[in-house]
Amino acid sequence: MRKDRLLHLCLVLLLILLSASDSNSTEPQYMVLVPSLLHTEAPKKGCVLLSHLNETVTVSASLESGRENRSLFTDLVAEKDLFHCVSFTLPRISASSEVAFLSIQIKGPTQDFRKRNTVLVLNTQSLVFVQTDKPMYKPGQTVRFRVVSVDENFRPRNELIPLIYLENPRRNRIAQWQSLKLEAGINQLSFPLSSEPIQGSYRVVVQTESGGRIQHPFTVEEFVLPKFEVKVQVPKIISIMDEKVNITVCGEYTYGKPVPGLATVSLCRKLSRVLNCDKQEVCEEFSQQLNSNGCITQQVHTKMLQITNTGFEMKLRVEARIREEGTDLEVTANRISEITNIVSKLKFVKVDSHFRQGIPFFAQVLLVDGKGVPIPNKLFFISVNDANYYSNATTNEQGLAQFSINTTSISVNKLFVRVFTVHPNLCFHYSWVAEDHQGAQHTANRVFSLSGSYIHLEPVAGTLPCGHTETITAHYTLNRQAMGELSELSFHYLIMAKGVIVRSGTHTLPVESGDMKGSFALSFPVESDVAPIARMFIFAILPDGEVVGDSEKFEIENCLANKVDLSFSPAQSPPASHAHLQVAAAPQSLCALRAVDQSVLLMKPEAELSVSSVYNLLTVKDLTNFPDNVDQQEEEQGHCPRPFFIHNGAIYVPLSSNEADIYSFLKGMGLKVFTNSKIRKPKSCSVIPSVSAGAVGQGYYGAGLGVVERPYVPQLGTYNVIPLNNEQSSGPVPETVRSYFPETWIWELVAVNSSGVAEVGVTVPDTITEWKAGAFCLSEDAGLGISSTASLRAFQPFFVELTMPYSVIRGEVFTLKATVLNYLPKCIRVSVQLKASPAFLASQNTKGEESYCICGNERQTLSWTVTPKTLGNVNFSVSAEAMQSLELCGNEVVEVPEIKRKDTVIKTLLVEAEGIEQEKTFSSMTCASGANVSEQLSLKLPSNVVKESARASFSVLGDILGSAMQNIQNLLQMPYGCGEQNMVLFAPNIYVLNYLNETQQLTQEIKAKAVGYLITGYQRQLNYKHQDGSYSTFGERYGRNQGNTWLTAFVLKTFAQARSYIFIDEAHITQSLTWLSQMQKDNGCFRSSGSLLNNAIKGGVEDEATLSAYVTIALLEIPLPVTNPIVRNALFCLESAWNVAKEGTHGSHVYTKALLAYAFSLLGKQNQNREILNSLDKEAVKEDNLVHWERPQRPKAPVGHLYQTQAPSAEVEMTSYVLLAYLTAQPAPTSGDLTSATNIVKWIMKQQNAQGGFSSTQDTVVALHALSRYGAATFTRTEKTAQVTVQDSQTFSTNFQVDNNNLLLLQQISLPELPGEYVITVTGERCVYLQTSMKYNILPEKEDSPFALKVQTVPQTCDGHKAHTSFQISLTISYTGNRPASNMVIVDVKMVSGFIPLKPTVKMLERSSSVSRTEVSNNHVLIYVEQVTNQTLSFSFMVLQDIPVGDLKPAIVKVYDYYETDESVVAEYIAPCSTDTEHGNV
């Protein structure tokens, strides 16, 4: 070791003797700085420094990519010294990115400097974000959202968005928009959810021009908005030194008032490991009544929580539940407190990243406790390079201390600084958590300089706030000899942010005699262009070409140039009053406003659009180092001529590769440098004897270490809080009637005027809550701006709430409760009135008083016993009015509010008749040809009709689809809960749109309505899709169902036809077609898969030929060409089937023949079509110019009815297929075809129900399809009219006229007499469509039925208080009819008045293999049973009392065959305590 040191010293002496003194050089110096990452289509800068020029030169920059060479800039420079930055813009490139060569040339008469280096060129990517109007939606609501695009400077981009789509939780695409042009950088879209969407997480997906994919999630679920919020205040951090912890729990209504009730709080520490079997988690629980402020506060001793014991999580889990007084509504909130054993913690808040010999090394530390609270006046220790020498310092009142290290005599290359308060304790106890005193450490490398000249930018602590000018201190030490003959030295600086040079400048320093030490200040405005991170580089070139410089990083507040302010005026306003939303932004900004009920945000907090979230979209926030594929610099390839360097007679021997140099500063900022100056430290290529540890230590012992005595001013961010304007208020309104309760209130785009202001007049909704509003604005000049949240509290000093049941049966008695709440600070005297009505009788239960005294934050509840007298919807109007009174409330004087002295709430009660509702419909198509046509209408009622329940109406329409168009989403008075039934909500819209298009009657209003139904129906149908592309009646629920061939074909053709009107994902069509092709057998027929719910058509559909005919029809209606292989093969199957069918007996295969006739017609096989139609004509039922077809095995019609029953579903369906076969005859139907079709249509129209549908789903779909084809084939525009007169035998008579102007208008009148005899007369010269609908209730009677039904309650009698409020409904059913099994059966259980089903117990029924689905709809429970046989099925579920009702009437349970609705049975049940005279149910 000693020998090596002697050899090293000898070598150094030899080099000194051989070295020659270097002379100062005044050669021209060049430096060009360009970012290594360049974005296209946006201005970029490169900075040029020329020094000591002695001739005019041309500076040029060019970019070479592929075969293209593009000039970026050219500058002619005549000045001796020049520093400036030049702007240039790159055009968009074909690829998203490419590596290019940047060439710099500086050329003059004697100068020719050339450098070439790589840079990465990227196409500019827009920053796209999505905002929804709220974070969660209920089924059936409309999702509204905005798509916004800005560039990297946050200015709006009017780009073309190639694709936007919505995905449901199964990742099915349910909507899409293509080639959407953004205007002013924004576009607003909306999408209606179906009434039964898949619940879960949805997402909006945006694909940008550059190929980027942005996703924004939202949730769809059924929910009830919370009335109040539970706020839990616990310390974020609990120290093991704490003896007590304060827990505060408050309940606050969304309108800001305290909640009365009981709070229960539990505090738990869970075990940290499951293996701790010898311990149990520690929990404490307490309950208290909330005080008048809606809060409780409790001190908990930490010993009870064992916070110093090991084996538990270092967390305290707090759960608080508040049960609201009066309603027992519970809301829960959870919080977690971290438990820390950190007693003190030191951290560097401001420290030099490197050190420079001769410039003090500065550092600032902050001492905090485990909760982050500063510890003042505390002594701590400072150690340098782990030496045995320590210094110390004391923190100030803010817990801060600043110190410096004198670096003059430091000769090593690394500085290791450690600060600590307590020496580490190596002892450890397994049962107790030990105190932890954390120190901090920092390593700084030395900066290399040949001359010992340095410049240093002092770091700044914290984040710099926008809107002020920041001053940066630059310290320097300069070797006078290195200055040569300079009289002044120019320091140049530039600032980079987001990877772009944004600022530049120069500071000139006079050169003094002798070595120079000192500092100067640089300042720059802190604005959005330097956020979020600014990097400053300062440098100067000495005469010999050495570059001295430094770089520093500054954290900048995320801010935007467009300052947006949003405020409500007034900030508190009563419901239904007028308010103003004021927006201030950069002039001509377009502002997007949103205001949401705070309850929505309480239920589903969302990641709000904020300045931070927008900054997170930036592709480059801070450019550090070079991109991987351009990390090559020409200078890096230089050779190393010798292992030492001589400068001014001194020898420099590199000791470490960790030293920093100018090149490392530039590279750290991502800057490419083109220069002939000295920016690198010398390279060490040979092994140099290392310096001993002792030598390193001595270097630091000589360092002076001391505390800098200067005050510290923390640099904290400041925000301007603009108070809401409370000067304006709405005028006095004597009374409010509240009925408008939205979840999203404001969703608008508003343009700001040239003064930068916009004011929007709004009407406050009726919800008593707090509305949270936000806005973002877009300006071409100022870019994007985002407001802070503005609030409006919708509130009135007192209001009334009503409690009543959803429905009652006439004769029942219920209690109507009205609660008046007073939130005025003073007492008021209130008069509460229930508006009288002939529709009900009411008597007040409490002692009748003219007015009631209600003091501040108190409530008064009044009740009435109500007996409804009329049927239908009955309105109850309750008003609470503050009265003038000289009478005292207690000891207080009564006050009257200045505004909103009266509050009125109107709620509707459905009063139903006793018994079971029946509906009879009489429909006909009547054509007058100049002569009068009369019909007799005899309306009779059965003997068991319920008094006053009968009502009838008469309707006239001029269009064959008029009735269906009026009720397109309500064609059947039946549930739609399966995949087939949903299609009756979907398919008819297509037929209506096609028909109105063909007849040129389609209006925008009708189109918008039908398209909306298609969109929601499409969503619903996807619920029944299988992964393989098939569909089944109830979807892939519980893995019980296979894909259904028939339903898949039905959905496939309907989706394909809907493509003309709405977006349908092609993947759904392709997958279904593929699945069906796999079902095709070698003989061309299709294999049956899955189960059908309608046995009436199973005989045909399960037969290969019938199913194959149906599937072929579906494929042809897509339409697939006849030449398609699947269709061509199917034709072989159908031809074989017809050859078999025509050999059958009379009446057999009627359904199959009807399908084959239509299929051959679509295939263009007219010979087969005619052959089949002739065969069917022989089997037709013809009567009174009406034609239809029946099944041979048709069930017998019930006897003893007043009216002929509606035709079964299967017969309407097969008759409609025959009609389609006539109408699709090619090349066109003959006059004979149309005559036959007219007689068929007349029969079909007579089967139509009051809503325009038929008896079930498939007959409705096929019949409306056929009627639409008939209507289009026979439609003619004529000026002729028709008159319709309806009159009775007395004085009633009404006339209607039908002409071209009112073809689609539903003309309707109520008929006065029931029972009654009416005469209908039609005159004129056109066809009209007449319909009479009669409804009445009958009392249940024992009848023969193919179903056996038994219903009972558990308990059966009123055997205790619990039976008043809850009981179980149990029922059994079986099928006793002529068939082996029923079709799908609906069990419809109506609730007893005042009771509601317990939904979880209903849902559990779906676990049964016989139950396919359950629904809770209003006051009914629906159970879908796939089929019922002679085996008894049992079901049961619980019901709970919601509202007390007295004199309870029995409720009805109805079981019916969905496809043969005449097959039904009805039974009654009664609540156990409905006849309890002692307690009653009230």
UniProtKB/Swiss-Prot annotation:
One of its GO terms (cellular component) is extracellular space. Pfam families: A2M (PF00207), A2M_BRD (PF07703), A2M_recep (PF07677), MG2 (PF01835), MG3 (PF17791), MG4 (PF17789), TED_complement (PF07678). Keywords: Bait region, Disulfide bond, Glycoprotein, Protease inhibitor, Secreted, Serine protease inhibitor, Signal, Thioester bond. It is found in: Secreted. One of its GO terms (molecular function) is protease binding. One of its GO terms (biological process) is female pregnancy. Residues 1-25 form the signal peptide. Glycans are attached at N54, N69, N246, N392, N406, N753, N875, N932, N997, N1430. The keyword Disulfide bond applies. SMART domains: A2M, A2M_N_2, A2M_recep, Thiol-ester_cl. Residues 685-735 are annotated as: Bait region. The keyword Disulfide bond applies. Plasma. Prominent constituent of late-pregnancy sera. Changing R1128H: In a colorectal cancer sample; somatic mutation. Its main location: secreted. Homotetramer, which consists of two pairs of disulfide-linked chains. Belongs to the protease inhibitor I39 (alpha-2-macroglobulin) family. Is able to inhibit all four classes of proteinases by a unique 'trapping' mechanism. This protein has a peptide stretch, called the 'bait region' which contains specific cleavage sites for different proteinases. When a proteinase cleaves the bait region, a conformational change is induced in the protein which traps the proteinase. The entrapped enzyme remains active against low molecular weight substrates (activity against high molecular weight substrates is greatly reduced). PANTHER family: MACROGLOBULIN / COMPLEMENT (PTHR11412), PREGNANCY ZONE PROTEIN (PTHR11412:SF92). This is Pregnancy zone protein. It comes from Homo sapiens (Human). The gene is PZP.
